[in-house]
Amino acid sequence: MAKSPAARKGXPPVAVAVTAALALLIALLSPGVAQAAGLTATVTKESSWDNGYSASVTVRNDTSSTVSQWEVVLTLPGGTTVAQVWNAQHTSSGNSHTFTGVSWNSTIPPGGTASSGFIASGSGEPTHCTINGAPCDEGSEPGGPGGPGTPSPDPGTQPGTGTPVERYGKVQVCGTQLCDEHGNPVQLRGMSTHGIQWFDHCLTDSSLDALAYDWKADIIRLSMYIQEDGYETNPRGFTDRMHQLIDMATARGLYVIVDWHILTPGDPHYNLDRAKTFFAEIAQRHASKTNVLYEIANEPNGVSWASIKSYAEEVIPVIRQRDPDSVIIVGTRGWSSLGVSEGSGPAEIAANPVNASNIMYAFHFYAASHRDNYLNALREASELFPVFVTEFGTETYTGDGANDFQMADRYIDLMAERKIGWTKWNYSDDFRSGAVFQPGTCASGGPWSGSSLKASGQWVRSKLQS
Protein backbone atom coordinates (compact mmCIF):
# COMPACT_ATOMS: atom_id res chain seq x y z
CA MET A 1 0.00 0.00 0.00
CA ALA A 2 2.97 2.30 0.45
CA LYS A 3 3.49 4.72 -2.42
CA SER A 4 6.52 5.12 -4.65
CA PRO A 5 8.88 8.03 -3.96
CA ALA A 6 8.45 11.29 -5.83
CA ALA A 7 12.11 11.27 -6.83
CA ARG A 8 15.06 8.86 -7.15
CA LYS A 9 14.82 7.10 -10.47
CA GLY A 10 17.35 4.94 -12.28
CA UNK A 11 18.58 1.44 -12.93
CA PRO A 12 20.24 -0.67 -10.24
CA PRO A 13 24.00 -0.15 -9.78
CA VAL A 14 26.46 -3.02 -9.85
CA ALA A 15 26.59 -5.01 -6.62
CA VAL A 16 29.70 -5.80 -4.65
CA ALA A 17 30.32 -9.53 -4.35
CA VAL A 18 30.60 -11.01 -0.86
CA THR A 19 32.13 -14.17 0.49
CA ALA A 20 30.39 -16.84 2.50
CA ALA A 21 29.91 -16.14 6.21
CA LEU A 22 32.72 -17.31 8.47
CA ALA A 23 33.07 -17.78 12.22
CA LEU A 24 36.34 -17.24 14.08
CA LEU A 25 37.05 -17.05 17.80
CA ILE A 26 39.43 -14.11 18.23
CA ALA A 27 39.95 -13.98 21.99
CA LEU A 28 38.98 -15.80 25.17
CA LEU A 29 40.13 -15.05 28.71
CA SER A 30 42.73 -17.58 29.85
CA PRO A 31 41.72 -20.20 32.46
CA GLY A 32 43.87 -18.59 35.15
CA VAL A 33 42.36 -15.16 34.66
CA ALA A 34 38.88 -16.61 34.33
CA GLN A 35 39.20 -18.18 37.77
CA ALA A 36 40.29 -14.88 39.27
CA ALA A 37 37.94 -12.53 37.47
CA GLY A 38 35.25 -14.83 36.03
CA LEU A 39 34.74 -12.48 33.10
CA THR A 40 35.31 -13.68 29.53
CA ALA A 41 35.27 -11.87 26.21
CA THR A 42 34.73 -13.61 22.89
CA VAL A 43 35.06 -11.94 19.50
CA THR A 44 33.51 -13.90 16.63
CA LYS A 45 34.05 -13.03 12.99
CA GLU A 46 30.56 -13.23 11.47
CA SER A 47 31.25 -12.33 7.84
CA SER A 48 34.12 -11.16 5.67
CA TRP A 49 34.63 -9.57 2.28
CA ASP A 50 37.50 -8.17 0.20
CA ASN A 51 38.08 -5.03 2.24
CA GLY A 52 36.82 -5.88 5.71
CA TYR A 53 34.74 -8.02 8.00
CA SER A 54 32.10 -7.83 10.72
CA ALA A 55 32.49 -9.31 14.19
CA SER A 56 30.38 -9.73 17.30
CA VAL A 57 31.76 -9.17 20.81
CA THR A 58 30.27 -11.15 23.70
CA VAL A 59 31.17 -10.49 27.33
CA ARG A 60 30.11 -13.18 29.79
CA ASN A 61 29.95 -12.84 33.57
CA ASP A 62 30.60 -16.18 35.26
CA THR A 63 31.01 -14.69 38.74
CA SER A 64 28.45 -14.66 41.53
CA SER A 65 28.30 -10.85 41.53
CA THR A 66 26.90 -8.27 39.14
CA VAL A 67 29.44 -6.56 36.87
CA SER A 68 28.63 -2.85 36.72
CA GLN A 69 30.77 -1.99 33.68
CA TRP A 70 32.93 -3.78 31.14
CA GLU A 71 35.69 -2.70 28.81
CA VAL A 72 37.15 -4.70 25.93
CA VAL A 73 40.33 -3.39 24.31
CA LEU A 74 41.43 -4.83 20.96
CA THR A 75 44.67 -4.16 19.14
CA LEU A 76 44.32 -4.18 15.36
CA PRO A 77 47.26 -4.28 12.95
CA GLY A 78 48.18 -1.26 10.88
CA GLY A 79 45.89 -0.71 7.92
CA THR A 80 42.80 -2.02 9.71
CA THR A 81 40.39 0.32 11.51
CA VAL A 82 36.96 0.12 13.10
CA ALA A 83 34.41 1.61 10.71
CA GLN A 84 31.19 1.04 12.64
CA VAL A 85 30.15 -0.14 16.12
CA TRP A 86 26.85 -1.20 17.64
CA ASN A 87 25.74 -1.71 21.25
CA ALA A 88 28.98 -0.21 22.64
CA GLN A 89 30.85 3.05 23.04
CA HIS A 90 34.03 3.08 20.96
CA THR A 91 37.23 5.08 21.27
CA SER A 92 40.56 4.55 19.57
CA SER A 93 44.17 5.53 20.08
CA GLY A 94 46.54 4.41 17.37
CA ASN A 95 45.94 0.70 16.81
CA SER A 96 44.14 0.26 20.15
CA HIS A 97 40.34 0.17 20.11
CA THR A 98 38.30 0.34 23.32
CA PHE A 99 34.70 -0.89 23.55
CA THR A 100 32.65 -0.14 26.67
CA GLY A 101 29.08 -0.95 27.62
CA VAL A 102 26.21 1.44 26.96
CA SER A 103 23.21 2.16 29.17
CA TRP A 104 21.29 -0.99 28.26
CA ASN A 105 24.13 -3.53 28.45
CA SER A 106 26.85 -2.12 30.72
CA THR A 107 25.54 -4.05 33.75
CA ILE A 108 25.80 -7.84 33.53
CA PRO A 109 24.14 -10.05 36.17
CA PRO A 110 25.74 -13.32 37.31
CA GLY A 111 25.62 -15.79 34.44
CA GLY A 112 24.58 -13.06 32.02
CA THR A 113 26.09 -11.74 28.81
CA ALA A 114 26.40 -8.44 26.97
CA SER A 115 26.66 -8.35 23.19
CA SER A 116 28.04 -5.75 20.83
CA GLY A 117 29.85 -5.75 17.52
CA PHE A 118 31.83 -3.85 14.95
CA ILE A 119 32.68 -3.63 11.27
CA ALA A 120 36.37 -3.51 10.42
CA SER A 121 37.78 -1.71 7.41
CA GLY A 122 40.75 -3.82 6.39
CA SER A 123 41.44 -7.53 6.77
CA GLY A 124 43.69 -7.53 9.83
CA GLU A 125 42.39 -9.48 12.82
CA PRO A 126 42.98 -8.48 16.48
CA THR A 127 46.47 -9.30 17.74
CA HIS A 128 45.73 -8.61 21.41
CA CYS A 129 42.65 -8.40 23.61
CA THR A 130 41.90 -7.40 27.21
CA ILE A 131 38.72 -7.51 29.25
CA ASN A 132 38.60 -5.08 32.17
CA GLY A 133 42.39 -4.87 32.07
CA ALA A 134 43.12 -8.61 32.09
CA PRO A 135 44.84 -9.95 28.97
CA CYS A 136 42.54 -12.22 27.00
CA ASP A 137 45.44 -14.18 25.58
CA GLU A 138 47.40 -14.61 28.83
CA GLY A 139 49.02 -18.03 28.81
CA SER A 140 48.28 -18.54 25.12
CA GLU A 141 50.42 -18.01 22.07
CA PRO A 142 48.88 -15.93 19.29
CA GLY A 143 46.93 -18.35 17.16
CA GLY A 144 47.24 -21.04 19.84
CA PRO A 145 44.55 -22.51 22.09
CA GLY A 146 42.41 -19.78 23.55
CA GLY A 147 44.26 -17.01 21.75
CA PRO A 148 43.63 -14.92 18.67
CA GLY A 149 43.02 -17.02 15.60
CA THR A 150 41.44 -20.02 17.32
CA PRO A 151 38.40 -21.20 15.33
CA SER A 152 35.18 -21.32 17.30
CA PRO A 153 32.86 -24.33 17.16
CA ASP A 154 30.48 -24.38 14.22
CA PRO A 155 27.49 -22.28 15.40
CA GLY A 156 25.15 -24.61 13.57
CA THR A 157 26.05 -27.46 15.92
CA GLN A 158 24.82 -25.57 18.97
CA PRO A 159 21.03 -25.44 19.46
CA GLY A 160 19.73 -21.89 19.55
CA THR A 161 22.93 -20.35 18.19
CA GLY A 162 24.31 -19.45 14.79
CA THR A 163 22.57 -17.61 11.99
CA PRO A 164 18.79 -17.85 11.53
CA VAL A 165 19.22 -20.34 8.68
CA GLU A 166 21.59 -22.44 10.80
CA ARG A 167 19.06 -22.45 13.63
CA TYR A 168 15.94 -23.30 11.64
CA GLY A 169 17.11 -24.94 8.42
CA LYS A 170 14.73 -25.18 5.47
CA VAL A 171 11.38 -23.85 6.68
CA GLN A 172 8.11 -25.47 5.69
CA VAL A 173 4.39 -25.00 6.21
CA CYS A 174 2.89 -27.28 8.85
CA GLY A 175 -0.83 -26.86 9.44
CA THR A 176 -1.51 -23.15 9.83
CA GLN A 177 2.06 -22.20 10.74
CA LEU A 178 5.56 -21.86 9.38
CA CYS A 179 7.87 -24.47 10.91
CA ASP A 180 11.57 -25.21 11.01
CA GLU A 181 13.07 -28.29 9.40
CA HIS A 182 12.12 -30.35 12.46
CA GLY A 183 8.46 -29.33 12.39
CA ASN A 184 8.60 -26.78 15.23
CA PRO A 185 6.63 -23.54 14.70
CA VAL A 186 8.93 -20.59 14.07
CA GLN A 187 8.45 -16.84 13.69
CA LEU A 188 10.77 -15.11 11.22
CA ARG A 189 11.11 -11.34 11.74
CA GLY A 190 12.90 -8.80 9.62
CA MET A 191 12.73 -5.96 7.13
CA SER A 192 11.45 -5.31 3.63
CA THR A 193 13.51 -3.20 1.28
CA HIS A 194 11.97 -0.35 -0.67
CA GLY A 195 11.85 -0.73 -4.46
CA ILE A 196 15.33 -1.57 -5.66
CA GLN A 197 14.87 0.70 -8.69
CA TRP A 198 15.01 3.66 -6.30
CA PHE A 199 16.86 2.54 -3.18
CA ASP A 200 19.30 -0.12 -4.33
CA HIS A 201 22.13 2.03 -2.93
CA CYS A 202 20.76 1.26 0.55
CA LEU A 203 21.61 -2.43 0.08
CA THR A 204 25.34 -2.70 0.65
CA ASP A 205 27.69 -5.01 2.51
CA SER A 206 27.68 -2.73 5.55
CA SER A 207 23.91 -2.14 5.65
CA LEU A 208 23.18 -5.86 5.33
CA ASP A 209 25.78 -6.64 7.99
CA ALA A 210 24.00 -4.20 10.29
CA LEU A 211 20.62 -5.79 9.56
CA ALA A 212 21.93 -9.30 10.26
CA TYR A 213 24.34 -8.75 13.14
CA ASP A 214 23.21 -5.57 14.89
CA TRP A 215 19.48 -5.46 14.20
CA LYS A 216 19.33 -9.28 14.58
CA ALA A 217 16.88 -9.81 11.71
CA ASP A 218 15.99 -13.32 10.58
CA ILE A 219 14.78 -12.41 7.11
CA ILE A 220 14.89 -9.75 4.42
CA ARG A 221 12.22 -9.13 1.79
CA LEU A 222 13.69 -7.99 -1.52
CA SER A 223 11.08 -5.76 -3.19
CA MET A 224 11.31 -5.59 -6.96
CA TYR A 225 8.62 -3.41 -8.51
CA ILE A 226 7.43 -4.54 -11.93
CA GLN A 227 6.11 -1.19 -13.14
CA GLU A 228 7.17 2.32 -11.97
CA ASP A 229 10.62 2.10 -13.60
CA GLY A 230 11.02 -1.46 -12.33
CA TYR A 231 11.51 -4.91 -13.84
CA GLU A 232 9.62 -4.25 -17.09
CA THR A 233 12.19 -1.60 -18.07
CA ASN A 234 15.20 -3.94 -17.82
CA PRO A 235 14.31 -7.57 -17.05
CA ARG A 236 17.91 -8.78 -17.40
CA GLY A 237 19.37 -6.09 -15.15
CA PHE A 238 16.78 -6.48 -12.41
CA THR A 239 16.98 -10.28 -12.47
CA ASP A 240 20.76 -10.16 -12.17
CA ARG A 241 20.53 -7.75 -9.25
CA MET A 242 18.06 -10.01 -7.46
CA HIS A 243 20.49 -12.92 -7.90
CA GLN A 244 23.19 -10.79 -6.29
CA LEU A 245 21.01 -9.67 -3.39
CA ILE A 246 19.84 -13.22 -2.69
CA ASP A 247 23.48 -14.32 -2.51
CA MET A 248 24.41 -11.39 -0.25
CA ALA A 249 21.62 -12.24 2.19
CA THR A 250 22.49 -15.94 2.04
CA ALA A 251 26.10 -15.19 2.97
CA ARG A 252 24.80 -13.61 6.19
CA GLY A 253 22.54 -16.51 7.12
CA LEU A 254 19.33 -14.57 6.45
CA TYR A 255 16.13 -15.93 4.96
CA VAL A 256 15.02 -14.13 1.79
CA ILE A 257 11.57 -13.31 0.43
CA VAL A 258 11.75 -12.69 -3.32
CA ASP A 259 8.99 -10.10 -3.72
CA TRP A 260 7.30 -9.74 -7.14
CA HIS A 261 6.07 -6.27 -6.26
CA ILE A 262 2.96 -5.73 -8.35
CA LEU A 263 0.93 -2.68 -7.32
CA THR A 264 -0.35 -0.72 -10.33
CA PRO A 265 -2.07 -2.28 -12.20
CA GLY A 266 -3.48 -4.44 -9.43
CA ASP A 267 -4.44 -7.40 -11.60
CA PRO A 268 -1.57 -9.91 -11.33
CA HIS A 269 -2.54 -11.44 -14.69
CA TYR A 270 -1.23 -8.26 -16.35
CA ASN A 271 2.30 -9.42 -15.52
CA LEU A 272 1.70 -13.18 -15.78
CA ASP A 273 4.17 -13.89 -18.57
CA ARG A 274 6.82 -11.72 -16.94
CA ALA A 275 6.26 -13.52 -13.62
CA LYS A 276 6.71 -16.93 -15.21
CA THR A 277 9.93 -15.85 -16.90
CA PHE A 278 11.36 -14.28 -13.75
CA PHE A 279 10.45 -17.00 -11.27
CA ALA A 280 11.61 -19.75 -13.64
CA GLU A 281 15.13 -18.31 -13.61
CA ILE A 282 15.18 -17.41 -9.92
CA ALA A 283 13.93 -20.85 -8.85
CA GLN A 284 16.34 -22.63 -11.20
CA ARG A 285 19.34 -20.71 -9.86
CA HIS A 286 18.49 -20.86 -6.15
CA ALA A 287 16.64 -24.18 -5.74
CA SER A 288 19.52 -25.70 -3.79
CA LYS A 289 19.41 -22.96 -1.15
CA THR A 290 17.52 -23.53 2.10
CA ASN A 291 16.64 -19.89 2.78
CA VAL A 292 14.57 -18.65 -0.19
CA LEU A 293 10.81 -17.96 -0.09
CA TYR A 294 8.84 -16.68 -3.09
CA GLU A 295 6.17 -13.95 -2.87
CA ILE A 296 4.44 -14.10 -6.24
CA ALA A 297 2.08 -11.09 -6.06
CA ASN A 298 2.70 -8.20 -3.66
CA GLU A 299 -0.65 -6.39 -3.48
CA PRO A 300 -3.39 -7.51 -5.87
CA ASN A 301 -6.21 -4.96 -5.92
CA GLY A 302 -9.36 -4.31 -7.89
CA VAL A 303 -9.73 -7.99 -8.77
CA SER A 304 -11.57 -10.91 -7.20
CA TRP A 305 -10.02 -13.58 -5.03
CA ALA A 306 -10.92 -16.13 -7.71
CA SER A 307 -8.79 -14.20 -10.21
CA ILE A 308 -5.84 -14.01 -7.82
CA LYS A 309 -6.18 -17.73 -7.13
CA SER A 310 -6.12 -18.57 -10.84
CA TYR A 311 -2.96 -16.48 -11.28
CA ALA A 312 -1.28 -18.27 -8.38
CA GLU A 313 -2.18 -21.65 -9.83
CA GLU A 314 -0.37 -20.72 -13.06
CA VAL A 315 2.79 -19.33 -11.45
CA ILE A 316 3.28 -21.87 -8.65
CA PRO A 317 3.86 -24.84 -11.02
CA VAL A 318 6.62 -22.86 -12.77
CA ILE A 319 8.46 -22.58 -9.46
CA ARG A 320 7.67 -26.13 -8.35
CA GLN A 321 9.16 -27.62 -11.52
CA ARG A 322 12.50 -26.19 -10.45
CA ASP A 323 12.22 -25.81 -6.68
CA PRO A 324 9.76 -28.41 -5.39
CA ASP A 325 9.83 -27.70 -1.67
CA SER A 326 10.37 -24.00 -0.87
CA VAL A 327 7.60 -21.90 0.66
CA ILE A 328 5.52 -19.75 -1.70
CA ILE A 329 3.51 -16.75 -0.45
CA VAL A 330 0.36 -15.67 -2.30
CA GLY A 331 -0.89 -12.08 -2.15
CA THR A 332 -4.51 -11.57 -1.13
CA ARG A 333 -7.38 -9.38 -2.24
CA GLY A 334 -7.51 -5.66 -1.44
CA TRP A 335 -3.78 -4.82 -1.33
CA SER A 336 -3.06 -8.06 0.57
CA SER A 337 -5.50 -7.11 3.31
CA LEU A 338 -7.10 -10.59 3.27
CA GLY A 339 -9.90 -8.82 1.41
CA VAL A 340 -10.79 -6.40 4.21
CA SER A 341 -9.95 -3.26 2.20
CA GLU A 342 -12.46 -4.35 -0.47
CA GLY A 343 -15.27 -5.40 1.86
CA SER A 344 -14.42 -9.07 2.21
CA GLY A 345 -12.33 -11.12 4.62
CA PRO A 346 -10.39 -14.33 5.29
CA ALA A 347 -13.44 -16.57 4.89
CA GLU A 348 -13.37 -16.24 1.09
CA ILE A 349 -9.82 -17.62 1.03
CA ALA A 350 -10.65 -20.46 3.41
CA ALA A 351 -13.64 -21.39 1.25
CA ASN A 352 -11.60 -21.40 -1.97
CA PRO A 353 -7.91 -21.98 -1.17
CA VAL A 354 -5.13 -22.12 -3.73
CA ASN A 355 -4.69 -25.65 -5.01
CA ALA A 356 -1.06 -26.11 -3.94
CA SER A 357 0.92 -27.28 -0.93
CA ASN A 358 3.55 -25.55 1.21
CA ILE A 359 2.06 -22.11 0.58
CA MET A 360 1.14 -19.16 2.78
CA TYR A 361 -1.06 -16.10 2.30
CA ALA A 362 0.16 -12.50 2.61
CA PHE A 363 -1.30 -9.87 4.91
CA HIS A 364 -0.28 -6.19 4.92
CA PHE A 365 -1.25 -3.50 7.41
CA TYR A 366 -0.36 0.08 8.31
CA ALA A 367 -1.10 0.65 11.97
CA ALA A 368 -2.16 4.30 11.81
CA SER A 369 -4.78 3.45 9.17
CA HIS A 370 -5.77 -0.16 9.77
CA ARG A 371 -7.55 -0.59 13.05
CA ASP A 372 -9.33 -3.36 14.93
CA ASN A 373 -11.19 -4.83 11.96
CA TYR A 374 -7.85 -5.52 10.25
CA LEU A 375 -6.30 -6.84 13.45
CA ASN A 376 -9.29 -9.13 13.96
CA ALA A 377 -9.02 -10.34 10.35
CA LEU A 378 -5.40 -11.33 10.97
CA ARG A 379 -6.43 -13.17 14.13
CA GLU A 380 -9.21 -14.98 12.27
CA ALA A 381 -6.98 -15.86 9.32
CA SER A 382 -4.27 -17.31 11.56
CA GLU A 383 -6.78 -19.90 12.75
CA LEU A 384 -7.78 -20.87 9.20
CA PHE A 385 -4.62 -20.93 7.08
CA PRO A 386 -0.90 -20.01 7.17
CA VAL A 387 -0.27 -16.24 7.07
CA PHE A 388 2.91 -14.22 6.65
CA VAL A 389 2.86 -10.43 7.19
CA THR A 390 5.24 -9.58 4.38
CA GLU A 391 4.71 -5.82 4.71
CA PHE A 392 3.54 -3.48 7.46
CA GLY A 393 4.16 -0.03 8.82
CA THR A 394 3.59 1.95 11.99
CA GLU A 395 2.39 4.90 9.88
CA THR A 396 -0.54 5.36 7.48
CA TYR A 397 -1.14 3.25 4.38
CA THR A 398 0.65 5.90 2.26
CA GLY A 399 3.92 4.96 3.91
CA ASP A 400 4.00 8.41 5.49
CA GLY A 401 2.34 10.38 8.27
CA ALA A 402 2.32 10.00 12.04
CA ASN A 403 3.28 6.70 13.63
CA ASP A 404 0.87 4.80 15.85
CA PHE A 405 3.22 2.65 17.90
CA GLN A 406 0.49 1.66 20.35
CA MET A 407 -1.60 0.06 17.61
CA ALA A 408 1.51 -1.43 16.02
CA ASP A 409 2.40 -3.04 19.34
CA ARG A 410 -0.99 -4.76 19.38
CA TYR A 411 -0.20 -6.31 16.01
CA ILE A 412 3.30 -7.26 17.19
CA ASP A 413 1.85 -8.97 20.28
CA LEU A 414 -0.64 -10.96 18.20
CA MET A 415 2.02 -11.99 15.72
CA ALA A 416 4.31 -13.11 18.55
CA GLU A 417 1.49 -15.07 20.18
CA ARG A 418 0.57 -16.84 16.92
CA LYS A 419 4.17 -17.04 15.61
CA ILE A 420 3.25 -15.10 12.48
CA GLY A 421 6.33 -13.99 10.56
CA TRP A 422 6.76 -10.36 9.54
CA THR A 423 8.91 -7.94 7.53
CA LYS A 424 8.49 -4.22 8.14
CA TRP A 425 8.36 -1.65 5.33
CA ASN A 426 11.03 -0.30 4.66
CA TYR A 427 14.84 -0.51 4.93
CA SER A 428 15.71 2.72 3.11
CA ASP A 429 16.29 6.44 3.61
CA ASP A 430 13.17 7.59 1.75
CA PHE A 431 11.87 10.88 3.17
CA ARG A 432 8.59 9.31 4.32
CA SER A 433 8.12 8.28 7.94
CA GLY A 434 7.90 4.59 7.04
CA ALA A 435 11.55 4.44 5.97
CA VAL A 436 13.82 3.56 8.88
CA PHE A 437 16.76 5.83 8.00
CA GLN A 438 17.07 9.59 7.81
CA PRO A 439 17.45 10.95 4.24
CA GLY A 440 21.06 10.83 3.10
CA THR A 441 22.06 7.90 5.32
CA CYS A 442 22.52 5.46 2.45
CA ALA A 443 24.57 7.84 0.31
CA SER A 444 26.82 8.41 3.32
CA GLY A 445 27.29 4.69 3.91
CA GLY A 446 25.58 4.76 7.29
CA PRO A 447 25.76 4.66 10.21
CA TRP A 448 22.87 2.20 10.39
CA SER A 449 21.86 2.96 13.99
CA GLY A 450 21.77 5.83 16.46
CA SER A 451 20.96 9.28 15.12
CA SER A 452 20.55 7.93 11.58
CA LEU A 453 17.32 6.21 12.58
CA LYS A 454 13.88 7.75 12.35
CA ALA A 455 11.36 6.93 15.08
CA SER A 456 10.04 3.92 13.17
CA GLY A 457 13.60 2.67 12.71
CA GLN A 458 14.34 2.90 16.42
CA TRP A 459 11.08 1.10 17.17
CA VAL A 460 11.57 -1.83 14.79
CA ARG A 461 15.26 -2.27 15.60
CA SER A 462 14.36 -2.64 19.27
CA LYS A 463 11.68 -5.20 18.37
CA LEU A 464 14.15 -7.25 16.34
CA GLN A 465 16.79 -7.12 19.06
CA SER A 466 14.38 -8.18 21.80
Swiss-Prot record:
Gene Ontology process terms (BP): cellulose catabolic process
Domain of life: Bacteria
Keywords: Carbohydrate metabolism, Cellulose degradation, Glycosidase, Hydrolase, Polysaccharide degradation, Signal
Annotated GO MF terms: cellulase activity; polysaccharide binding
Entry EC number(s): 3.2.1.4
Pathway: Glycan metabolism; cellulose degradation
CBM2 domain: residues covered: 37-139
Region annotated Disordered, chain positions: 129-166
Keyword Translocase in record: no
Active site residues of this protein: 299 (proton donor), 391 (nucleophile)
PROSITE patterns linked to this entry: CBM2, GLYCOSYL_HYDROL_F5
Signal peptide: 1-36
Catalytic activity entry: Endohydrolysis of (1->4)-beta-D-glucosidic linkages in cellulose, lichenin and cereal beta-D-glucans
Identification of the protein by name: Endoglucanase E-5
Organism: Thermobifida fusca
